[in-house]
Amino acid sequence: MEWKIESLPVPYDKAMCFMQQRVEGIANKTQDELVWLLEHFPLYTAGTSARSEELLTDSLFPVYSTGRGGKYTYHGPGQRIAYVMMDLKARDKCNVRLYVETLGEWIVKTLKHFSIRSYFNPNLIGVWVNHNGSEKKIAAFGIRIRKWITYHGVSINVFTDLSHYSGIIPCGIKEYGITSLKTLGVNILYEEFDVVLKKEFNKVFCNC
């Protein structure tokens, strides 16, 4: 498994092209699987089940339609994105549901390292915390699979400007809010967070 970590924001369309090419390379056995850590410039993305009324304004940031599952979400500075390109066929114990659950376990264990208690919700896909008596999402999931190769992945709010979510109904869920590590009192940089992400990834996927 190769790891690629970007130091500067990656344009969204460039990232999509890169992932599609990498998926083909993995399927053809000419390239290795990849975990790609990055952030994007501010933007909204619409998944395959997004509804037009969930986009409250299109004047804040660019809006991209994407082939991943899910609804509207935000990407931008302060949000660590992990795009995971993995061959599920090469893992006898892995199927799509187990893959998504294992992604959830990965993020939960990463957050636990920073003393954040969280949980993966299979019904409201993502990782959630109970903050001041209310449930808030801290990590969103958007997955696509082609030729049994996964791509897209997980976005975790590290020090994200949460006001940027105001132009959408995040993931189509009105009842609950969004939070970040910074909002929860954990002030860290990507460098520290990435070390833990990689360590916990290797643990949870080692038997998969």
UniProtKB/Swiss-Prot annotation:
Could you state one GO cellular component term attached to this entry?
Answer: cytoplasm
* Classification via SUPFAM superfamilies: Class II aaRS and biotin synthetases
Q: What is its EC number?
A: 2.3.1.181
Write out the pathway annotation from the protein's UniProt entry: Protein modification; protein lipoylation via endogenous pathway; protein N(6)-(lipoyl)lysine from octanoyl-[acyl-carrier-protein]: step 1/2
Q: Which UniProt keywords apply?
A: Acyltransferase, Cytoplasm, Transferase
Q: Name one GO biological process term.
A: protein modification process
The protein's matches in Pfam families, at most eight in alphabetical order, are given as: LplA-B_cat
**Reactions that this protein is recorded to catalyse:** octanoyl-[ACP] + L-lysyl-[protein] = N(6)-octanoyl-L-lysyl-[protein] + holo-[ACP] + H(+)
Its subcellular locations are: Cytoplasm
Any one Gene Ontology MF annotation carried by this entry is:
lipoyl(octanoyl) transferase activity
Sequence ranges assigned to domain BPL/LPL catalytic in this UniProt record: 29-208
- Site described as Lowers pKa of active site Cys, positions? 137
CDD domains associated with the record = LipB
Where, in this chain's numbering, is substrate bound?
Answer: 68-75, 140-142, 153-155
The positions flagged as active site in the entry are 171
NCBIfam families recorded: lipB, PRK14341.1
Q: What does this protein do?
A: Catalyzes the transfer of endogenously produced octanoic acid from octanoyl-acyl-carrier-protein onto the lipoyl domains of lipoate-dependent enzymes. Lipoyl-ACP can also act as a substrate although octanoyl-ACP is likely to be the physiological substrate.
Q: Which family is annotated?
A: Belongs to the LipB family.
Q: What else is known?
A: In the reaction, the free carboxyl group of octanoic acid is attached via an amide linkage to the epsilon-amino group of a specific lysine residue of lipoyl domains of lipoate-dependent enzymes.
Q: What is this protein called?
A: Octanoyltransferase
